[in-house]
Amino acid sequence: MKQYDVKISHVALRDMEQIYSYIADCLMEPDTAMGQYNRIAKAIQSLNILPERCALVESEPERTQGLRQMLVDNYSVFYIV
């Protein structure tokens, strides 16, 4: 089975850090924040195998460009294979 290299953009990392900070600081749930951060990171890393398993987005021109969406709990991960 083919494996892909997964590269996380600086913007995506910043978004993940902001999610963590909001849950940890605003909601005062640091353990929940770490769990959410880890679930998102694990889901992103899982794209190294079968990244086509998630659907293309419906909007254009993003669909034509190959943009896909993966849901992780209440969050969306957008990526291109």
Sequence positions of predicted segments:
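Basic, Lys/Arg-enriched alpha-helical interface segments
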Residues: 1-67
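Enriched for short, Lys/Arg-rich terminal
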Residues: 27, 68, 72-81
